[in-house]
Amino acid sequence: MPLLLHPRFPSSHAAACAHRAAAAHRDARPALRLPELHATRRRRNNVACRATRAREAPPQQQNTAAALSKEAHKYFDHAVVTVRAGDGGHGAVLAMPASPSTDAPKSPRRRSDKGKRSGVKKVSYKRNYDGSVALPMGGHGGDVVVYADEAEETLLRFHEKARYCAKRGGNVGATGTLSSRMHNGFAGETLRIPVPVGTVVKRKKGAVLADLAHPGDEVIVARGGQGGISLIDVPEYRRRKAMVLSPNIMRDVSDRVLIHGQPGEEVSLELILRVVADVGLVGLPNAGKSTLLSAITLARPDIADYPFTTLMPNLGRLGGDPALGALQFSSEATLADLPGLIEGAHLGKGLGRNFLRHLRRTRVIVHVVDAAADDPVDDYKIVREELRMYNPQYLERPYVVVLNKIDLPKAQDRLSSLAFEISSIGCEECDGNNTSEDSLNGNTGEHNTSSETKVEGGEKELRDYPRPQAVVGASVLKHIGIDEMLKEIRAALRKCFDHRLPEP
């Protein structure tokens, strides 16, 4: 007959067998060494605090930073950011101060009390224009302002941080009983965001807010929320008397929503950088534009013998005209070295559309042509045609053609023929009254297809636009013909300046 097991009888034969089997299984397990035992006991969960997680950039952010460093020319002039103004501060629910005439216990008057009461000062509150008590309000939320700063050069930093928030307004400093010492909540600090000079600020897929073309220009892009009001909470039998002091009486529990501040505005902005320059240098890659800029200004752009060395516009300052003498004044001019243009740039090839839009503010255009190339005239026509296809008003501005690299033998032999052939492209009568005021001042639309670009029989061609103001030969590397080139550039600038002067 089998032996029955029962938990109340652990000393039974079956229980003893089970105990021996468990001990044998425990002895069969490999013994842990001392270091492994300590490591097992000290095993902890890795918990990272918020500051540690903030310092460790996520992989997506690291990839963005790598793309910005390698391909900065694709992002330097365009960015989309989100800004949020500060919320308004909260008001408070206040109680009326106790009235000594009604709340104090009655006691027989004495002559000594009469003198003491006469010295008690009455509480005075701030009043509104209608005589009511001015209750404290929550602070106004901080606004968001975008302003033009000369220290900023590109919009690259907005790709690393694309959201900006202003501080909220402060709450009413005290709660409880209404007192004359209460004050409004502190206003939130205005958030000022610097951008490069020449940045166009517009709502994303919306209207243009401002064109920050001059240093110090600014625009409020988001306004902070209004602070909440304060309410007086009094019993119903005292409301009529309290209405004399202030109309802000809490009549119901639902009125508490009035003490909350209003939320600040949140908008998505599109920032577009258009270089502010008086003179724009254009040409095919490796024509010598960067070398020319470094020869006549203090700018030091990257210069190499391979195409597309310049991927972002370089700026330089051209000094005043020394030929005017000490009694006359000539302001400095800003030159912009644009990246090289290729055929089909107006369609976006080689980021041409991004580069061509930086000519919008220029008043004078300088065409830099490699005189030692296989066909310099055809190179000149390619660039002119790209300007015409992108914005026809670019061709109506005064321009100078610089035949560069004349120190080479191939360019010296045909310099005079090249200058004659290029100067003959265009019409003579266009040099006068047909040049629009907007094109001289650098105020052109992005894509102007008005009736001015039409002639009888169709659109204008290159021969229907003005001829160059001058065609000069130079070698900016050998400093040959620099003075003559500067003379013609300053003459073109003077023409634009004289056109803006009002008639006496």
Curated annotation (Swiss-Prot):
Domain named Obg: residues: 73-276
GO MF terms held by the record: GTP binding; GTPase activity
Positions of GTP binding: 283-290, 337-341
Domain OBG-type G: 277-494
InterPro entries: G_OBG (IPR031167), GTP-bd (IPR006073), GTP1-OBG_CS (IPR006074), GTP1_OBG_dom (IPR006169), GTP1_OBG_dom_sf (IPR036726), OBG_GTPase (IPR045086), P-loop_NTPase (IPR027417), Small_GTP-bd (IPR005225)
Region (Disordered): 24-46, 93-122, 436-463
Residue stretches of biased makeup (Basic residues): 107-122
Composition skew (Basic and acidic residues), residue ranges: 24-39, 453-463
Composition-biased stretches (Polar residues): 436-452
Alphabetically ordered keywords of this record: GTP-binding, Nucleotide-binding
One GO location term (cellular component): mitochondrion
Keyword GTP-binding: yes
Function: May bind GTP and have GTPase activity.
Similarity-based family: Belongs to the TRAFAC class OBG-HflX-like GTPase superfamily. OBG GTPase family.
NCBIfam families: small_GTP (TIGR00231)
Name the UniProt record assigns to this protein: Probable GTP-binding protein OBGC2
